[in-house]
Design a protein with these regions (language model features):
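SAM-dependent methyltransferase catalytic region
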Residues: 1-177
């Protein structure tokens, strides 16, 4: 948070200094190039955040997934603020909650009730008036995250590659909590 405030203070200080000076054309081109570099950085970081895959293989009530959600949500909001700050344009808002729930967070638990509690806890965190809740059926699943053999685990046998094909098509999970 302190680093974020420092970035904003640096930006404000830079603007004040630029007003004091009568920038030459070369200096203005340099300033624009620096702003473009900052924008490029924030866009790349945004893409990293959008693509990261986090899994809790024993999600229980969803406590760890909720913490991961909070972290990603805070980071995405900050990235959008920084992009807006450097672009000096309109803030580009999209549904961060839905993005995180459907693309970033995944969980498995052997207890069906725990799976439903995890979904409920994430829905309670992200529910908005007059908006449909994000579907979590493809991301939060019931199964034995250790045993894939149905002869051993019965109906709870869990094959990761079959259950999360889109994740494993791109190399698997980035973070396991």
């Amino acid at each position: 948070s302190t680093n974020r405030n420092n970035l904003i203070e640096i930006r404000s200080w830079t603007e004040i200094q630029e007003k004091k000076l009568n920038l030459t054309e070369d200096e203005e081109m340099f300033r624009v190039a620096v702003i473009q570099l900052h924008l490029e950085y924030w866009k790349k970081y945004e893409n990293v955040l959008k693509e990261i895959k986090i899994c809790d293989p024993a999600c229980g009530s969803g406590a760890f997934l909720n913490q991961c959600f909070d972290y990603l949500h805070e980071e995405m909001n900050f990235v959008l603020e920084m992009k807006h700050l450097y672009a000096e344009g309109q803030l580009n808002l999209f549904d961060i909650d839905k993005q995180i729930l459907q693309n970033n967070l995944f969980g498995v638990d052997i207890n069906p009730e725990s799976v439903e509690i995890t979904k409920l806890s994430l829905w309670l965190k992200t529910a908005k008036k007059n908006q449909t809740l994000a579907s979590l059926d493809d991301n939060i699943k019931c199964g034995n995250s250790i045993v894939a053999d149905s002869n051993v685990a019965g109906e709870y046998a869990f094959n990761w590659k079959e259950e999360f094909p889109q994740v494993f098509a791109n190399g698997g999970f980035d973070i396991i909590v």
